[in-house]
């Protein structure tokens, strides 16, 4: 059996690693680098270029140079319309995504392009190891859906690799980080790469790696930060020269490269120069672009993206039923975590300084190599327990969603439930497979349907139909329905079981929690009413007790009447506002009372007055 390699197939860069002498080692590519750009290009003569050499010629050949392809893999065209606008090459398709290659007058699937990157990594690994590499463990973002995982496996197959395991990137990072950890730790992996964002919380220690929860955003990454800068540069150039560069593919490619370079530089310096001579040619001569960008402006331009990093962190903590105090260590993964504002956000949200001991570019591939070592038997005593991100079930009588596998269940897993017929003499059942957190089928994501025929006629409720859900270690789902009376069986493998955008996932979770949120809202309303009634009571008592000036008393009485009316009309917004107003009025009553006391009982001996500060005894 040959060596099994671990591959981090990244949006921007890819890395390959292997176990050597019981330790994971990152393999240097043919060009002498430890990371390989995930870029494929075709020249006018039909030559294929992969990696650094492809990236270098991108400015001169933007329409035939393909990068950030991971953002398109395993997706429908209507899911990637925004991402398609961010690249200079042409992305087309009716349903499935196609990438146009004018140089060859053909088009490719994203899997085919990714396969070229995988093939180069495998070839470089083969030269390093000294024997052909045919098996691999490949990483994917934790929030990749089933079709994206399947497409990644297909890319490996096209590259001539047997993909033994698909492993989540944050989980791989935890393997690399926690390989030699003996004591138990709860770690949060914050993985912000070139095109995707994941957060996973794991229990790590003594060879056991258990994922407690995962969250993410498959539409957020370093590319989006670059896009913000490119848009800014285009606007600045238009102000200076009155020229719109949005349709100039070569200029866009140069701006994209300049944006990426500026982003990287601003991680270590506070200001950088962008100089692009001959950016545009006009009848009056060439136009150059020179500008200065400081870190503060970069952070301002990217503030919405940085803020989006907060939600998955909070969601992961909530799903794991943990607070920030429960997190022992924070591990940063992905080149985009080098952005100072991102690190500051992580530190602010979790109140913890992130670990600097791992290389964010290499740690995922290192973890994949550890998993490869486990599969090859080279690494012993490692137990990896990952989870599925959303609940899975079937539609039952009344349109109800009956959950069979609940969200954040450890995988691989197999679970079965017994169901029966809804009418007398029913000889077939339709199994409608669903994904989501809501109580009714119509509110969840439909994954597919299949029919089980040949059920023996019987009164309703008598036949026993066993429905089994099976999720393998790669996260791929299959469903089987079996009539226990006749032995008839039918199954379906769900390809695309998690074809959901981050927005859909968030919506499902939010809607599932709607009842809890409604209870909280009702409780807040009751508390507000109680507060209002208490303030009215207190104000009326004080008005009776203290003799106030008419010009002070009249407005307070008016506020009390308005608040009583607002309570009757259930106008809670007005109740809140008037409560604050009445609270301020009560403070004024106190001031009036004390000022009267001071004027009616003057101090005979001012020297007897002692200035003192009092602290409340607890």
Curated annotation (Swiss-Prot):
It is found in: Plastid, Cyanelle. The keyword Chaperone applies. Keywords: ATP-binding, Chaperone, Cyanelle, Nucleotide-binding, Plastid, Stress response. It comes from the Eukaryota. Its main location: plastid. Residues 595-618 are annotated as: Disordered. InterPro entries: ATPase_NBD, Chaperone_DnaK, Heat_shock_70_CS, HSP70_C_sf, HSP70_peptide-bd_sf, Hsp_70_fam. The keyword Plastid applies. It holds the Pfam family HSP70. GO terms for cellular component: cyanelle. GO terms for molecular function: ATP binding; ATP-dependent protein folding chaperone; unfolded protein binding. Belongs to the heat shock protein 70 family. Acts as a chaperone. This is Chaperone protein dnaK. It comes from Cyanophora paradoxa. The lineage of its organism: Eukaryota, Glaucocystophyceae, Cyanophoraceae, Cyanophora.
């Amino acid at each position: 059996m040959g060596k099994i390699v671990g591959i981090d197939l990244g949006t921007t860069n890819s890395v390959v690693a292997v176990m050597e002498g019981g330790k994971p080692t990152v393999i240097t590519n043919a060009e002498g680098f430890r990371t390989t750009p995930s870029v494929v290009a075709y020249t006018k003569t039909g030559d294929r270029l992969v990696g650094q050499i492809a990236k270098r010629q991108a400015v001169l050949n933007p329409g035939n140079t393909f990068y950030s392809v991971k953002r398109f893999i395993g997706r429908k065209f209507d899911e990637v319309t925004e991402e398609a606008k961010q690249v200079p090459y042409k992305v087309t398709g009716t349903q499935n995504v196609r990438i146009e290659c004018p140089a060859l007058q053909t088009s490719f699937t994203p899997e085919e392009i990714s396969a070229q990157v995988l093939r180069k990594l495998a070839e470089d690994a083969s030269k390093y190891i000294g024997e052909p590499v045919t098996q691999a463990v490949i990483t994917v973002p934790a929030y990749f859906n089933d079709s994206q995982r399947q497409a990644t496996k297909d890319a490996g197959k096209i590259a001539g690799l047997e993909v033994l395991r698909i492993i989540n990137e944050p989980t791989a990072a935890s393997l690399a980080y926690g390989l030699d950890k003996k004591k138990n730790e709860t770690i949060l992996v914050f993985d912000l790469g070139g095109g995707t964002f994941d957060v996973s919380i794991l229990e790590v220690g003594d060879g056991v790696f258990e994922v407690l929860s995962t969250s993410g955003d498959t539409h957020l990454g370093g590319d989006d930060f670059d896009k913000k800068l490119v848009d800014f540069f285009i606007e600045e150039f238009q102000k200076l020269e009155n020229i719109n560069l949005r349709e100039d593919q070569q200029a866009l490619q140069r701006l994209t490269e300049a944006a990426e370079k500026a982003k990287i530089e601003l991680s270590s310096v506070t200001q950088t120069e962008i100089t692009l001579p001959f950016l545009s040619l006009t009848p009056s001569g060439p136009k150059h672009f020179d500008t200065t960008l400081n870190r503060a402006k970069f952070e301002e331009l990217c503030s919405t993206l940085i803020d989006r990093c907060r939600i998955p962190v909070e969601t992961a903590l909530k799903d794991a039923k943990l607070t920030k105090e429960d997190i022992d260590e924070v591990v940063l993964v992905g080149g985009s975590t080098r952005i100072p504002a991102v690190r500051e956000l992580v530190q602010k949200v979790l109140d913890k300084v992130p670990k600097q001991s791992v290389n964010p570019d290499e740690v995922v591939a290192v973890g994949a190599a550890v998993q490869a070592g486990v599969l090859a038997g080279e690494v012993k005593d490692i137990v990896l327990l990952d989870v599925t991100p959303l609940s899975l079930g079937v539609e039952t009588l009344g349109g109800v969603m009956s959950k069979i596998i609940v969200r954040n269940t450890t995988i691989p897993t197999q679970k079965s439930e017994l169901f029966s017929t809804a009418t007398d003499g029913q000889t077939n059942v339709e199994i409608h497979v669903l994904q989501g957190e809501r109580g009714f089928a119509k509110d969840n994501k439909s994954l597919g349907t299949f029919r089980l025929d040949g059920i023996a006629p019987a009164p309703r409720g008598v036949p026993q139909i066993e429905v089994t859900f099976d999720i393998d270690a790669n996260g791929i789902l299959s469903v089987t329905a079996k009539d226990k009376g006749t032995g008839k069986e039918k199954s379906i493998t769900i390809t695309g079981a998690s074809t959901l955008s981050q927005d859909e996932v968030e919506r499902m979770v939010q809607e599932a929690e709607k009842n809890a949120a409604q209870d909280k809202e009702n409780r807040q309303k009751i508390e507000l009413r109680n507060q209002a009634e208490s303030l009215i009571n207190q104000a009326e008592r004080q008005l009776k007790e203290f003799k106030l000036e008419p010009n002070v008393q009249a407005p307070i009485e008016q506020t009390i009447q308005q608040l009583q009316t607002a309570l009757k009309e259930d106008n809670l917004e007005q109740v809140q506002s008037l409560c604050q107003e009445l609270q301020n009025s009560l403070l004024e009553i106190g001031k009036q009372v004390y000022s009267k006391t001071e004027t009616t009982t003057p101090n005979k001996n001012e020297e007897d007055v002692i200035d003192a500060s009092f602290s409340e005894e607890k």
